[in-house]
Regions:
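Active-site catalytic motif of lipid deacylating hydrolases and related acyltransferases
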Residues: 1-57, 107-113
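Active-site signature of alpha/beta-hydrolase-fold catalytic machinery across serine-
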Residues: 19, 73-77
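Histidine-bearing beta->alpha loop at or near hydrolase active sites
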Residues: 33-35, 176, 192-197
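Catalytic histidine-centered segment of alpha/beta-hydrolase-like enzymes
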Residues: 39, 194-209
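Gly/Ala-rich beta-loop-alpha elbow adjacent to hydrolase catalytic centers
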Residues: 62-71
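Flexible "cap/lid" loop of the alpha/beta hydrolase fold
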Residues: 79-112
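Conserved alpha/beta-hydrolase catalytic His-Asp/Glu region
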Residues: 115-161
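Short beta-strand/loop motif that positions the catalytic acidic residue
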Residues: 171-173, 177
């Protein structure tokens, strides 16, 4: 049975993958470790990989959103077998231009912790979830988020400066993604109608594409 290491998104956990059908694989969910003060993204992801004993060569990895960016960073020193990137940026050039505003004017640092972990309709809109069950799951994930880690990870994303991309990968991206618009992304497999959380809303289509790629 093939093993695959799976990285979730910012403020998320393995529940976002609950609808994927990956029964034929041994799935290892990578859960976020607490960040160290002033730790950069490269140091963090390497520490994470060491903690979960991800092989330096030959591993299969999958990441959504922030988790995908973590994999891109790891791929600079790790020789992965198969890389699956979902609803993410493979380089800093894929990130929307408004991110630069928050880089130089980090108003998110002023947000109270309670605001960060309080789900709203704005979240539903940004993540592209309309189904009541999916909204309930997203709400629960947001409430369980760690506000301190959220701030550190958001800072890492906004200050990510990387143009080096992996040599081989499968990049699935929804054409309705409001957080990382597909217009900024190249070399993607377009998922029609998919938003940022299409891993929930389009799980059947995505499961098939992942399995086909991993079994090539």
């Amino acid at each position: 049975m093939k093993k695959i290491f799976i990285f979730s998104g910012l403020g998320a956990d393995k529940r976002v993958f609950s609808k994927l059908n990956l029964k034929e694989f041994e799935v290892v969910h990578i859960e976020w470790l607490p960040s160290i003060k002033n730790e950069n993204l490269s140091n963090y992801v390497n520490r994470l990989a060491e903690y979960y004993q991800i092989p330096a060569s030959g591993a299969n990895v999958l990441g959504i959103s922030f988790g995908g960016m973590c994999i891109v960073e790891l791929a600079k020193t790790y020789d992965f077998n198969k890389i699956v990137l979902i609803s993410t940026a493979i380089s800093s050039s894929n990130l929307p231009s408004y991110h630069k505003i928050f880089r130089y004017f980090p108003i998110y640092k002023l947000f109270p912790s309670q605001l960060i972990v309080t789900p709203t309709r704005i979240h539903h809109f940004l993540f592209g979830v309309t189904d009541a069950v999916d909204r309930k799951l997203l709400n629960a994930i947001i409430r369980d988020s760690n506000s301190g880690f959220f701030r550190w990870a958001l800072y890492s994303i906004l200050n990510w400066d990387s143009l080096e991309i992996p040599k081989k990968f499968l990049h699935l991206h929804g054409d309705k993604d409001r957080i990382i618009p597909i217009i900024n992304c190249n070399s993607v497999r377009r998922i029609a109608g998919g938003g940022h959380l299409m891993i929930l809303t389009h799980h059947n289509e995505i499961s098939i594409l992942i399995k086909e790629y991993l079994n090539e």
